[in-house]
Amino acid sequence: MLRSLVGSEMCIRDSIRTAGILYGYGTREELAQAGADLICRTPEEFTKIMLSEQQGDKRMNATERKIAEDLLSIRAVFFRPDEPFTWASGIKSPVYCDNRLILTAPDVRTEVETAIMQTIEREYPQAEVLMGTSTAGIAHAAIVGHMMKLPMGYVRGSSKDHGRQNQIEGRLEKGQKVVVVEDLVSTGGSVLDVVKVLRAAGAEVLGVVSIFTYGMKKGLERLAAAKVRNVSLTNFDVIAQVAAEQKYIKPEDVARLLQFRNDPSDESWIGGTN
């Protein structure tokens, strides 16, 4: 169990780790009795540990590989390092991601939704409600909610300008334990906006499950600072490695892709320059 103590409120969430992390009030003995193996005295210490957890074990597991293979096979993720795409922000990227294509590929869709369900059952067994991000996470939250027989809803990017002016669609009671379902995490901004809305509504956000993460430092740091845990089915490093193994890209391109991942604003990876 991974535990965080803030003031007198104990929040417990499951983790594959067997260590407890607490910070807040109380003597070291009191905190240890509460189940902590590691005690942090400041939010900064806690954030550092959370960041370490977000980075996680770099070894590829079977699910990461399978989902990577699936996304590559339907071109939901594909690489073009010699002819980079341009994001809306102006950043040039060697990768294009469109996880909406998952919905049009029934076999892959089944693999992905089953993996999301298994991840929630393993990492967030206390989940009471699934909330999709608008719009990419809505379908996945709905399908998995049906599979798990859990209520689902979604969070709009902004409140409606008519009717009840809801930003949260679906019934959500204060104190309910929520898992956010997202398709893609890059800098973390959009999913953190959703978490903020849910917390303001009184929900206890257990964490996020996403299909794919870039693993960008900025995103990891922002999630850790907000004390939000994200568990992704696969990640940029795994997809780059699998893409090279299956000859979607050249083996020498992997280093360039990771250079982009480490600092998207640095365009020295383009054309193989250093």
Q: At which residue positions do the language-model features occur?
A:
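PRPP-associated nucleotide enzymes
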Residues: E44, L51, Q55-V181, G189-N274
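Single conserved hydrophobic/aromatic residue that forms the stacking wall/gate
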Residues: M1-G7, I12
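A structural signal for hydrophobic residues in beta-strands of small regulatory alpha/beta folds
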Residues: I39-C40
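Short, glycine/polar-rich helix-capping loops at beta-to-alpha or helix-loop-helix junctions
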Residues: Y23-A34, G215-E221
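Conserved G/P- and acidic residue-centered "switch" motifs that form tight phosphate/ATP-binding loops
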Residues: R13, D183, G188
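Glycine-enriched alpha-helix->loop->beta-strand junction motifs that scaffold or abut catalytic
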Residues: I16-R17, G35, L150, V228
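Short beta-strand/loop segments at the ligand-binding rim of alpha/beta enzyme cores
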Residues: D14-A19, E204
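Active-site flanking residues adjacent to catalytic metal/cofactor-binding acidic residues
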Residues: S8, V181-E182
